[in-house]
Amino acid sequence: MMHFRKKSSISNTSDHDGANRASDVKISEDDKARLKMRTASVADPILDAVQEAQPFEQAADTFHDNMNRQSYFSNEEGHVLCDVFGQPITQADISNPTRARDERPLDTIRSFEYAVSGDPVWAQQLETPTYGFRVRPDFPVFGAAVTYDANGMPQQVGGASSQMYGEQAVYQPQQHVQTEEKQKKKKKGLFGRMKKK
C-alpha cells in the first residue's frame, strides 16, 4: 500500500497566499446593498400563500371579469339582489333571499351548479324565467283541461268553489261509541273463567 505525502513548502505557501488574497478583496457599499439577503428575494411558499388572493376574492374577480357568470350582487351600485340571469329579484324567497319566490326548486340547484362551474349548459336548463310556477306544456293533464293565467295560477272554472285547488280530503278518525253490549260484558280472568267476587 502506498502513502502519499504533501510537500510542506507548497502547502505552507498556498495557505499563506490564500489568507493574503481574502484580506485584499474589498466590497463596496453598492455591492453590499445589492447582495443583501431580503425576504422578498427568497422564494418562500408560506409568504406566497399569505400574499395570494383568498378563494372568495378570486371568485369575486371572476364574476366581475366574466359576464357569463353573474353574481347575486352584480348591480352593486344599487345593492339590488339579482338572480343568476342578472334580473333583479322583485319578490324574494323568505328562506333564501338570493332566489325569487316563484323559482322552481330544481332551478335553485341548477343555478348553484351554474354559479360554481360557470358552464352555460346549466343556465340553458333553467326553466323559471320561461315558466315560473306554471305547469310545463308537455306535462300530461290526463283529460282535465286546466288553464292558467298570466301569473301561472290555475283559472277557476264555474266559480262554484272558493278554494283554488279543489277540496282536499281531511282525515277524521272514527268515533268510538260504547254500546250497551260492551258495558254488560263481565270481565273474565285468566283462561276465560269468571272472576270471583
UniProtKB/Swiss-Prot annotation:
The UniProt record lists the keyword Nucleotide-binding: no
The entry's keywords: Isopeptide bond, Phosphoprotein, Ubl conjugation
Residue spans of biased composition, Basic residues class: 184-197
Glycyl lysine isopeptide (Lys-Gly) (interchain with G-Cter in ubiquitin), cross-linked positions: K26, K32
Record has Flavoprotein as a keyword: no
Any single GO BP term: regulation of cell wall (1->3)-beta-D-glucan biosynthetic process
Pfam family name, one: DUF2406
Segments of skewed composition (Basic and acidic residues): 14-31
PTM sites of type Phosphoserine: S11, S23
Transmembrane segments: none
GO CC annotation terms, alphabetical: cell periphery; cellular bud; cellular bud neck; cellular bud tip; mating projection tip
Region feature Disordered, mapped onto this chain: 1-31, 157-197
Compositional bias per record (Polar residues), positions renumbered to this chain: 158-177
Family membership: To yeast YGR273c.
Other remarks in the entry: Present with 10800 molecules/cell in log phase SD medium.
Descriptive protein name: Uncharacterized protein YMR295C
High-level lineage: Eukaryota, Fungi, Dikarya, Ascomycota, Saccharomycotina
